[in-house]
Amino acid sequence: MDNHNSSHQLYKKAMALVLAGGRGSRLYNLTDTRAKPAVYFGGKFRIIDFALSNCLNSGIRRIGVVTQYKSHSLLRHLQRGWGFLRGELNEFIDLLPAQQRVDEEHWYRGTADAVYQNIDILRSYGPEYVIVLAGDHIYKMDYSIMLRDHAQSGYKCTVGCVEIAKEEAYAFGIMGIDENRKITSFIEKPKKNAPTIPGTTDRCYASMGIYIFNSDYLYDLLEEDITNKESSHDFGKDIIPRVVSENQALAHPFSMSCVPRGEGIEPYWRDVGTIDAFWEANLDLAANMPELNIYDKDWPVWTAQEQLPPAKFVPDRNGNHGVITNTLASGGCIVLGSEISKSLMFSKVRVLAGCKIDQCVIMPEVVVGENCRLKKVVIDKGCDIPAGMVIGEDPIEDAKNFYRTDKGVVLVTKKMIDELKEK
């Protein structure tokens, strides 16, 4: 059987489960009203769109999305933008809120518990393979290649991994592997002595939060884990170490299935779990030749498409045209005679005359008043920035009025602006 037909058969035997219930507390006020996977990204998308688009582009069209924390924004996005799959062809995105399966007092207590509470639903669909995905990372990956790697390996679990510098290991689940990619150890966020990639002393394989299981094996693991009172019911802390101890875990390097892939191409994967990382990943897209290609017709990123007019850039009342460089502007934006560089503007942003905006991420429906100066600022949806406001130049004032990171990125929300206006 050739690879195409083999992959097609595997598609039909697999179901993806996207874990999208996390709060993302390190994003601070950006997740006050929405779950992390529902946070805006890249000028027009939501973070979860990348995992879901990978599923569709990989041929995986049976998808469950597990939700919990402040899920209204996420559910509305999925209903408006992802309702085009055809149930009569056994294609679907099934929305799975917390079931309180264990008792009426507990919601999802961990990533493994989130899957366990939907185990009956999974069984009803009868997949041979379950693909467990984190819904809060930015990357493009062909899951069908990983699925084929898993099916051909004979292992019961395959873990997607990305190469990182050893000094970054403290923030990830790190795996040790042998020359055949069998995972021999798995340590969640090691503070020291992280296992390195064979043949290197300064590189590690970090878990991407992507797992493929033989379904029956996964169900057995979850049913055993739920009875363990000492378990935190988490894949990284409990399930994967158990699989490793049973010699059933294979490592799948991201370089094998990243999109695009090939010699000289650096795989792009970002955990946007902090304000700094979120800001940096967004601004990556403003580069002349960004590492993440969102213009790729062969691997599109799908999302909800609001019907809006094109962005418009016009002179101010004095005829000043302004200058726009290395900037992405979504539909419905209007900019009057301002200077904007290396920034992203989501839909329906208004920038009035005389502004200077540099390295900013401006979310939908923001109005920037006249003569504002903004540098290294992330502005949440719906903010009305008063005329003449300066943000990003005075660290003391920024920290007093807004949230400022150690790297100097300033987060501005509607609540912060409203409180500032009341002073």
Swiss-Prot record:
Assembly: Homotetramer.
Protein origin, superkingdom: Bacteria
Positions with a binding annotation for alpha-D-glucose 1-phosphate: 108, 173, 188-189, 207
Metabolic or biological pathway, per its Swiss-Prot or TrEMBL entry: Glycan biosynthesis; glycogen biosynthesis
GO molecular function: ATP binding; glucose-1-phosphate adenylyltransferase activity
Xref: InterPro entries: ADP-Glc_PPase, ADP_Glu_pyroP_CS, GlgC_bac, GlmU/GlgC-like_hexapep, NTP_transferase_dom, Nucleotide-diphossugar_trans, Trimer_LpxA-like_sf
Annotated Pfam families: Hexapep_GlmU, NTP_transferase
Catalytic reaction list: alpha-D-glucose 1-phosphate + ATP + H(+) = ADP-alpha-D-glucose + diphosphate
Function comment: Involved in the biosynthesis of ADP-glucose, a building block required for the elongation reactions to produce glycogen. Catalyzes the reaction between ATP and alpha-D-glucose 1-phosphate (G1P) to produce pyrophosphate and ADP-Glc.
PANTHER family associated with the record: GLUCOSE-1-PHOSPHATE ADENYLYLTRANSFERASE, GLUCOSE-1-PHOSPHATE ADENYLYLTRANSFERASE-RELATED
Keyword Nucleotidyltransferase appears in the UniProt entry: yes
Protein name: Glucose-1-phosphate adenylyltransferase
Keywords, sorted A to Z: ATP-binding, Carbohydrate metabolism, Glycogen biosynthesis, Glycogen metabolism, Nucleotide-binding, Nucleotidyltransferase, Transferase
EC number(s) given by UniProt: 2.7.7.27
Family membership noted in the UniProt record: Belongs to the bacterial/plant glucose-1-phosphate adenylyltransferase family.
GO biological process: glycogen biosynthetic process
Keyword ATP-binding: yes
